[in-house]
């Protein structure tokens, strides 16, 4: 970020704007759907005796809309913006960028059609059937190629810390999605998981937990490491702490999935490992929160007038506080 070129590069802002607009659109739809199905809990007649309007079919659509449509479009938009600005070069491929936009919207629209129809793999956060999974994987691989291709052709020597988190989130989500979605198709709209029993449960929550850990945490931390310093007009509080934060987060988070499967058929050692990692995770999480908030050192006065900065700091504060949830495993640790 310290290296500023004299000539303004010709960035691809079109795809950034497209994803930003769809972030707003899908956010409204996804959260509106959440309000609707929440209302069904006290007024079941709101399903109007229509199968595709029942809670059990709309709830997966709500989670997919908020996580992958709303959150996904936000991540695409900001990562494409950040990688261009920090590398001072246009995206590696405009065609790949366009493919990721239209491909991602196609995945979302197909989810909107199939999930209310009851066409689902039954795996939480991975409900989409195998043809859509393949399309999603193709879009994601194109996304990875475009992002890392841009890093390769960058005009600055340094890879800014935000790109570390964004790159880690992309690679890990690819591995998680492909690994967990391995299935045996029996028709165009139905398949069965390649795994069975406790192994299937372990694969599912290795994916499910780390969808939160990398899609909704590492990716958004990449946003934080760019936009908080940018909005505050200050450098990152501690670059050394950001390095520790990065490696600690990606080293610990991937192991915590078994905490979704306590007191199940999963081997005890696996459950214990997930429990311990869940407790330890508050350390890198608080490191990131402190690094983000302390970046405002010398610029606290901007909170009075800058609403964007207020939202960023409040989100960091709630991120830090939410990590105390991991301490609920302390009684289990005592039992062990």
Describe every region a protein language model picked out.
Residues 335-336:
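Flexible, glycine/threonine-enriched loop-and-boundary segments that flank and lead into catalytic domains
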Residues 293-305:
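Alpha-helical transmembrane segments
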Residues 17-45, 52-119, 130-151, 163-188, ...:
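Hydrophobic cores of alpha-helical transmembrane segments in multi-pass integral membrane proteins
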Residues 53-59, 124-125, 197-205, 269:
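Membrane-interface segments at the starts/ends of alpha-helical transmembrane spans
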Residues 1-17, 45-52, 192-200:
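Extramembrane terminal tails and long inter-domain/linker segments of multi-pass membrane proteins
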Residues 2-12, 141-159:
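Cytoplasmic juxtamembrane interface segments
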Residues 12, 57-59, 301-304:
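Helix-boundary and loop/linker segments of multi-pass membrane transporters
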């Amino acid at each position: 970020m310290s290296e500023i070129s004299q000539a303004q590069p010709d960035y691809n802002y079109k795809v950034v704007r497209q994803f930003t607009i769809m972030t707003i659109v899908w956010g409204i739809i996804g959260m509106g759907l959440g309000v609707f199905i929440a209302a069904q809990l006290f007024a079941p007649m709101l399903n109007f005796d229509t199968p595709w309007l029942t809670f059990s079919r709309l709830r997966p659509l709500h989670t997919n809309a908020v996580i992958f449509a709303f959150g996904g479009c936000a991540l695409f938009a900001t990562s494409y913006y950040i990688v261009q600005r920090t590398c001072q070069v246009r995206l590696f491929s405009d065609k790949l960028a366009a493919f990721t936009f239209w491909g991602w919207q196609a995945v979302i629209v197909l989810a909107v059609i199939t999930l209310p129809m009851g066409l689902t793999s039954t795996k939480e956060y991975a409900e989409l059937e195998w043809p859509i999974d393949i399309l999603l994987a193709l879009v994601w691989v194109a996304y990875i190629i475009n992002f890392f291709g841009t890093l390769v052709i960058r005009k600055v020597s340094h890879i800014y810390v935000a790109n570390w988190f964004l790159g880690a989130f992309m690679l890990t989500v690819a591995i998680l999605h492909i690994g967990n979605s391995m299935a045996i198709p029996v028709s165009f709209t139905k398949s069965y998981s390649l795994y069975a029993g406790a192994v299937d449960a372990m694969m599912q929550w290795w994916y499910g937990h780390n969808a939160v850990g990398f899609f909704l945490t590492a990716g958004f931390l990449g946003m934080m490491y760019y936009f908080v310093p940018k909005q505050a007009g200050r450098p990152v509080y501690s670059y050394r702490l950001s390095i520790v934060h990065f490696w600690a987060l990606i080293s610990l988070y991937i192991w915590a999935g078994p905490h979704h499967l306590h007191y199940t058929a999963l081997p005890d050692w696996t459950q214990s490992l997930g429990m311990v990692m869940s407790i330890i995770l508050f350390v890198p999480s608080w490191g990131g929160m402190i690094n983000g908030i302390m970046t405002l050192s010398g610029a606290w006065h901007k909170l009075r007038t800058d609403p964007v900065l207020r939202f960023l700091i409040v989100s960091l504060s709630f991120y830090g506080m939410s990590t105390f949830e991991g301490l609920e495993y302390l009684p289990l640790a005592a039992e062990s």
